């Protein structure tokens, strides 16, 4: 099936030119191209059109889960009839195994898996295994982490069709080999049950159940049914059932793996004894032998991923299989915010190896644990056939890879211009800045101020508050959820000024901000590099009155580059607007507050948090921060009976699962904290 893009919008501005150039580059075999697009220019829409034009399976790489979720939702909107999938880490919580020799502390691995994301990950792999060409996978850096190989996955696909002669028990054995679990009592995702001549399989990558019925040894019908009502949804002549886990292997390979593990255990035990370290020798012997017993009896053990090299049949040092192995060789890679995403890929391997070094050296793991790892950057690079790097500030790597093939997208559909940049001396900068702030507040506009240190941010905020300016600060010591609330409060007018250290975060969308003030702009370093200054200045690009003031006594090379590049873009935008009679329009964006903004609202939310409902036509929901919830809701909770508490826990659990299904992880975390508090109250009531 071909890609079919669906949108009420048509490419405008320089989007058509960017789409054409990128499409031609891919069709002509260009290995790498850069899409240099300014904030708000519709880069995602451009990429969607390119994907539709070239018709290649595409991996879109983002540098965090939240932005990946946004891209996933956008792409699903553009391609409702195609396979748009989501592949990120499925851990709600993850504490990796570690050993701290200085304190002789061993930290056991601890984790909580998000069932909904696990389903989406399996759905992504299943779509790729199906051979479809119209597949888009939006992924975080998880795509470079180890998983089962495509050959083993292919071998465990169960293909059935109506009229097929197939012994039912043989079919059940195949399901078990594909890591489905029999459960005749409660059918859950990844389970199957048997009732007479009917087998129900709750697909690991779907919300529905596959029902297969037999007539003697012949498959009589194949139907998809609703997992709750069991009403028939569809009938099939043939069907492919994909494995229930990404780490599938055969029994033969498992037996080979156990023998290899035992051989390596003997070698490692002898090594520790040869250096006179009997404690480590005893430790590795006990731990590995216990794991072997678990694998023989149950087919798995805690930390089985550390033995993945043996189960995959890989040699020592050979790279693991990852999501990229499931794509055809000519797939297209799109790296969003590439100036951040590419360095992140390069950093994964070193951190993983450093942690495992102590585990191996002190006898907690065999050396094979090193081979359960993310790809090195060189390995990742070797698997890329064609790539588009998307960024407003592409780094040297992307520019070098593209060999100058840079496609610019500088025109915004709204006609908004890049902000003017003005340099002012640092002498009396605070008084000057205060005057600028008052000018903005009279127009009901907002101000961002970026400093070099946390202390400066806090002291400047205190100064502004003493001068009756509604100000707040935000930096890394402020909790993530509090930062989100501060951003929403800034937009809502609770604050007029936000002071921070690093306010250049990609995706920070604050259309009310008309002034960005950069203090100590001439202090060269990471926070005042050309790319950081450009990203920071871009925060004022969503307001029709956008302006940037750099306070500095000298103009550094980074400042000059930012000023020159912004002026160049601005002149192009002005000319385009003049030629086409476009008047810049202020962006109007609804404020969707995720948290209560007052004690009264928090109290109302606490009273009704167990009755939150997404009514038809309504999107409003109430969140409670963990500390606020404890403070305002305890009197209500304490008055509840055991039955009411149990009902509240069940209702909130359902809401948590729905939030996770909607990829709203922040809300899911809020519900989780509420559940923990309710359970604690229930335990106290006995």
Language-model segment annotations:
Residues 1-36:
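Conserved pre-motif I regulatory segment
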Residues 27-34, 56-57, 133-135, 445-446:
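Pre-Walker A (Motif I) flank of P-loop NTPase domains
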Residues 28-50:
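Walker A/P-loop
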Residues 34, 87-432, 436-442, 461, ...:
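N-terminal cationic and glycine-rich segments that engage phosphates or anionic surfaces
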Residues 57-69, 86, 280, 440-462:
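Conserved strand-helix element at the start of the C-terminal RecA-like helicase core
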Residues 80-89, 303, 446-448, 460-482:
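Conserved RecA-like helicase motor-core motifs
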Residues 87-98, 109-120, 451-456, 472-488, ...:
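Conserved helicase motor
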Residues 151, 453-475, 677, 681:
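Conserved helicase motor "Helicase C" RecA-like lobe of SF1/SF2 P-loop NTPases
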